[in-house]
Structures are given as structure tokens and as C-alpha cells.
């Protein structure tokens, strides 16, 4: 549905040959969709890593990626995402500098690009196809980069490496909300980086990504760098902006600049919508309000200059940023586990919140006392249960303590899972300083030596940044033999439902979605 919606917008405006659409699903899924519905996809996305083990976390291998590169058809080829630090933070650094790992990713991307071009030549399609690499610098957090200077250094290093590899490399100059980089610092970073001429920058309606909870470049930043550094939009898109009426013949913004309602009106007219302009604009206003109510920012208009946000939106974004800082450092109150029916308090090896933030591995393993507590529960229950519920603070303890949304979500999950015939344990493991992998450790302890399909359903406080205090559900199903192997269960077999809060995706719908996903896992 998302692929189709994006394709429809580009086709309707007649720019599908100038700009590709892409959905950040696993490359296997994109290839399957293209096989079922040829022409539905454009660029194929995949995150890649610098070692076989780290790539395994993304459920890819070099051989698999080579096959996808050779099978990809059309003008638009492959879109890779990389970033320094992804390998060692997933436990696959092997004592090697993260800069070396990043360069290996670029080597892999170059090889895959070559395989794509050769396959196209053999089929008589010509050798040219779009291949992009997006360096998501700073995405992981302070365990990789602490401040703005380190972020700039990383971006410059990666631009040089990418260009030396002959890649079209662009940047997602991003920073998490638990790094010591502010909204305003991000503007400084952009000015330091742009003279190195990256191939492109990401863009959002503001500098906050509401889905992933991090900061990156906004659309208004693109206006700024055109003004300051003289960069240009490519000719096809600039002509389209003129045709759309947001840029005049002299290249200056018109009264429709920064107005998504005007774009929606133009879209409807191209769809032969016969309603009056006012009716369509009123509908656009309603739809924008609906999107904003879900925590997604849509910028309208601009500030005193066309390269700045409208003042009210800028103030709103700064308030969200400040609230996110509170969420990141907050901790679960004493006795919180007692407020969750069946709650059993356990904890990880993090010494304190600072240790947890700066050393994520400490929040991925349980402390000895917690393991002993789980082992006693295992003896008590034997093999009566096949599904365990886990609740962790993650990077947003306040998502757990805001109203009763965590309790409601747990209760809804229990109800949905039992309705599906799951044998759900009565306890809920409430983990302090718990990251997603801490849930896997619970499964390894409780399911050790068992047979059959066994599940962990783990509710985690999402890292903040949307303006909503949201929870995610991580759903992991594996056989007993897999759970019995240390660290065998990982993100590559886990599904997630995100953005759950009373003010976003409500707990009941979140629980129903998780149950439906689990049914599809076997």
C-alpha cells in the first residue's frame, strides 16, 4: 500500500522518471513485491554492514545481496544505508575501528553496484542505473558520537571514503536526542559539512523524525544551503517546482511556497477532481490535522526568512526536544513493577542511567540475581507456558508511567494472545534499564532446553522525539533449540509494532496488530 501510494503521487505529477520512490522494508520483501506486481517498486533499499556477522543481524548475506543486485531491473537500482558504529554496537566489531567497518560497507556497495551494471548489460538494458548510499551518521547515539564536532568529523570522513569508492554518497546528518547535540547545533553541523559536497541530504518537514525519534536535516535547511552555498536543485525537479507554482520564473518563492494544501489541490486537479478549490483546500486542512494528531509534523509556511520554520512550529519543536531530554534520562519509580498485574522486577547489568545510555551492552544482559529469579520461575512453571510478556523502560521510562497506557497495553496483549490459544505466563517480567536484547536473554533463560515454538512479546519505551510518549512491541518467535543457544536469537527474526500511546496508535490496536503478526510467524 505504501509503495502504491508513493508511486501514485509521482505518476500523478508526471515526475516518476525524475525521482524514485522507495519504502524502507527488507530487500527480500521488496523483491517479492516486485515479483508479484512488476513495476510497483523503484529503488530497492537495504541496510548493510561491514562484516558477515553484522550483516546477519540485518538478515542479509553477500551472496543474497549479489542475487538481488543481479535481479534488479529498471532505471532505479539500489539504495544502501550505512553508518559508523552499527557493527560494534551489534556485538560484531571484532576489535576493529568503526571507520574500517564503514569503508568495508562502501566496498560491498561498490561490488553490488558493479554486479547490477553487469547484469543490466547482459540483458541489453544498458549499464546505467541509480545506486545511492546514504550515510546515516550519528543515528545510533552517544556510545558512538558524543558531540557535534565528532559528528562533523564522521560525515567528512565518510564523504571522502564514499567518493574514493566512486559512490553516489549522501548524508543523513542525524543526532539522537540523548547525544549532546541540540536542534541549533545541527544547523552549525550542516554549515561545516556542506563545502565537502555530499551527493544529497535527507529532509523532513522539521528537524525531528517522529518515527525514529532523532534529529536530521529539514526541508528548510535545503533552502538555507542553496542560499548560502549556491547549490541547486536538479533541472527536472526545478522545472516541476516552477510548474507547480511554488517557484516563479526568476527562481524565487511564490505565495504558495511551503504550502502543502496547494500541492494537494494540484494533485486533486491532476486526478480530475471537479470539486471547488475551497472544498479541496478544506479537505487538505482536515487531513493535515489528522496527520499532526498522529505525531507527524507537517510544516506550513515559513518564518521571517524562507529558510526558517514558522515561529509557532519552531517553538513547538523545541518544546518536544526539551521533553525528549527528560524522557531519555527518567527512570522507573520504585515499586513500578507492583503496578503491573503479575509484575516481577528484574534488572540488567547497567550500574546507573549514565552507564545505560553510554554503554548499551550493559542494558542487554541480565544481572545474576535476575537470572536466578527467572530460573526459579522456570522450575515453578515447568513447560506450562509458551509465551512470556516482558516490559522494559528502554529509552523512555515516562512512556511506561504516563497514565495507564503500559498496563493497558500489557492487558490487551494478554487478552489477544490467550484468544489465539497462546499459553501466556501469568508473570510480566519488568526490566529496569532494559533494551530490546534484554528480552532475548529472558527467553534464553526461561526456554532453555525446551522444544516447540516459544514466544517473547516485549514492550519497550521508544526513544522519544515524536511529542508522544510511545511504546513499541517487539515480537520474537523461535523454536526451543534456537532459544537454547546463547545469543542465537537476535533482531533478524524479530518484528516490531511501534508508536503505541493513548495519543498515537492506541494500545488496543497495537496489541491486535502484534497478535496478528505473531500468527504469521508460525
Where are these regions (language model features)?
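A glycine-rich helix N-cap at a beta->alpha junction
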Residues: 13-26, 450-455
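Internal active-site segments that recognize and position negatively charged phosphoryl groups
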Residues: 112, 374-417, 424-428, 435-445
Amino acid at each position: 500500500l505504501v509503495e502504491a501510494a508513493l508511486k501514485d503521487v509521482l505518476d500523478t505529477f508526471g515526475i516518476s522518471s525524475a525521482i524514485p520512490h522507495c519504502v524502507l522494508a527488507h530487500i527480500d520483501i521488496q523483491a517479492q513485491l516486485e515479483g508479484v506486481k512488476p513495476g510497483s517498486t523503484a529503488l530497492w533499499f537495504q541496510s548493510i554492514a561491514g562484516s558477515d556477522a553484522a550483516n546477519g543481524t540485518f538478515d542479509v548475506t553477500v551472496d543474497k545481496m549479489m542475487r538481488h543486485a543481479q535481479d534488479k531491473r529498471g532505471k532505479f537500482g539500489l539504495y544502501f544505508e550505512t553508518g559508523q558504529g552499527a557493527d560494534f554496537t551489534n556485538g560484531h566489531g571484532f576489535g576493529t575501528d568503526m571507520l574500517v567497518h564503514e569503508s568495508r560497507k562502501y566496498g560491498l556497495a561498490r561490488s553490488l553496484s558493479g554486479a547490477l551494471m553487469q547484469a543490466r548489460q547482459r540483458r541489453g538494458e544498458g549499464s546505467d542505473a541509480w545506486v545511492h548510499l546514504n550515510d546515516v551518521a550519528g543515528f545510533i547515539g552517544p556510545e558512538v558520537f558524543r558531540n557535534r564536532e565528532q559528528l562533523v568529523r564522521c560525515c567528512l570522513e565518510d564523504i571522502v571514503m564514499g567518493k574514493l569508492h566512486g559512490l553516489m554518497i549522501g548524508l543523513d546528518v542525524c543526532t539522537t536526542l540523548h547525544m549532546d547535540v541540540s536542534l541549533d547545533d545541527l544547523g552549525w553541523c550542516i554549515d561545516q559539512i556542506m563545502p565537502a559536497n555530499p551527493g544529497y541530504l535527507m529532509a523532513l518537514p522539521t528537524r525531528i523524525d517522529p518515527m525514529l525519534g532523532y534529529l536530521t536535516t529539514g526541508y528548510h535547511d535545503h533552502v538555507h544551503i542553496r542560499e548560502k552555498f549556491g547549490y541547486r536543485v536538479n533541472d527536472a525537479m526545478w522545472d516541476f517546482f516552477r510548474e507547480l507554482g511554488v517557484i516563479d520564473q526568476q527562481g524565487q518563492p511564490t505565495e504558495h511556497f511551503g504550502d502543502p494544501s496547494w500541492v494537494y489541490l494540484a494533485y486533486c486537479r491532476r486526478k480530475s477532481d471537479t470539486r471547488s478549490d475551497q472544498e479541496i483546500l478544506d479537505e487538505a486542512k482536515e487531513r493535515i490535522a489528522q496527520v499532526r494528531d498522529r505525531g507527524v509534523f507537517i510544516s506550513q509556511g515559513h518564518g521571517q526568512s524562507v529558510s526558517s520554520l514558522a515561529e509557532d512550529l519552531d517553538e513547538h519543536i523545541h518544546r518536544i526536544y526539551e521533553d525528549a531530554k527528560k524522557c531519555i534520562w527518567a527512570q522507573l519509580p520504585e515499586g513500578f513493577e507492583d503496578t503491573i498485574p503479575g509484575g516481577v522486577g528484574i534488572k540488567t547489568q547497567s550500574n546507573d542511567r549514565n552507564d545505560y545510555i553510554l554503554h548499551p551492552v550493559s542494558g542487554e544482559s541480565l544481572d545474576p540475581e535476575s537470572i536466578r529469579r527467572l530460573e526459579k520461575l522456570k522450575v515453578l512453571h515447568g513447560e506450562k507456558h509458551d509465551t512470556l510478556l516482558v516490559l522494559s523502560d528502554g529509552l523512555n521510562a515516562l512512556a511506561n508511567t504516563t497514565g495507564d497506557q503500559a498496563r493497558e497495553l500489557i492487558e490487551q496483549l494478554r487478552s489477544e494472545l490467550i484468544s489465539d490459544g497462546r499459553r501466556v505466563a501469568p508473570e510480566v517480567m519488568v526490566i529496569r534499564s532494559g533494551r530490546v536484547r534484554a528480552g532475548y536473554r529472558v527467553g534464553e533463560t526461561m526456554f532453555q532446553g525446551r522444544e516447540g515454538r516459544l514466544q517473547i512479546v516485549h514492550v519497550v519505551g521508544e526513544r522519544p522525539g515524536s511529542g508522544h510518549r510511545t511504546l513499541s512491541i517487539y515480537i520474537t518467535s523461535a523454536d526451543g533449540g534456537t532459544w537454547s543457544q546463547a545469543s542465537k536469537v537476535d533482531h533478524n527474526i524479530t518484528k516490531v509494532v511501534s508508536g503505541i500511546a493513548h495519543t498515537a496508535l492506541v494500545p488496543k490496536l497495537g496489541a491486535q496488530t502484534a497478535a496478528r503478526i505473531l500468527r504469521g510467524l508460525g
